[in-house]
Amino acid sequence: MDIAFCYESVLPKRGGCETYIASLVRRLALDGHQIHLYASRWDASALPTSVIFHQVDLPWSPRFMRPWSFGSACLKALKGQDHDVSVGFDKTWGLDVLYPQGGLFAATAEHNLLKYKNPTIRKVVKFFKTFDLSHQSFLMLERLQYLGMKKSIVIGISEMVRDHFQKYYQISANDLRLVRIAMDPNRFQETDRLKRRIEWRQQWNIDPSDCLALFVGMNYRLKGLEPLLHAMKLLPEKSP
């Protein structure tokens, strides 16, 4: 198949969606598909040599307008092309397939409020979001994606995301596909996991019976590090 991917930036070293897209491109190319990438920037060295790149130039714009600029530029660039299928990730619309790696923005915004312990603060923050141009712009774009005239095939990454589509946009589970995010099995080797576990515990003077949690990431408040630490405190002293 001749497949077009649309995503503003594909720099796999940054992680997240960009890493997943690169992995998916490699797998599809290995299976013999012709991949086209419509993007503003990319790391060609991290992608198969068979990929055909299409530069999508964007003028400067405020943050809340950038997704609109890229989405519009992609649709313009795709005109006249003869791809079998076009695939968009996150903030694009009007394509054959939408595969939102970050789930729904509406759900994310609501869940973000839970990082505030005080219910009153949550209400205040939610109220001020009604005046946030970026917030309102992203909500409007999301409604265009899933409730607009062009009906795309929507792929959810989990049951939770599928439920969010039903809750926020009344999109039936029957109208969605479910494809869970899969890790490249060649990226991490598990054969020496126990050996590494022993070595690092010895280096850090951690007893083999001690319960240990490893957090790797940014924005620890949003990712839930604080509740994890509180949970560790509540564990029985001799817990396995």
Sequence positions of predicted segments:
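An amphipathic, basic-hydrophobic alpha-helix
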Residues: 60-86, 94-95, 136-144
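Short His-centered aromatic/hydrophobic patch
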Residues: 88-93, 100-102
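Short hydrophobic "strand-cap" motifs at the C-terminus of beta-strands
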Residues: 6-8, 157, 179-182, 215-217
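Nucleotide-sugar donor-binding and catalytic loop/hinge architecture
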Residues: 1, 192-212, 236-238
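Donor nucleotide-sugar binding/catalytic pocket of nucleotide-sugar-dependent glycosyltransferases
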Residues: 127-197, 206
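Conserved donor-binding/catalytic core segment of Leloir-type glycosyltransferases
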Residues: 155, 207-223, 229-232
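Nucleotide-sugar-dependent glycosyltransferase donor-binding/catalytic pocket residues
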Residues: 13, 184, 218-222, 234-237
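N-terminal strand-loop element at the rim of the active site
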Residues: 7-14, 27-65, 77, 175
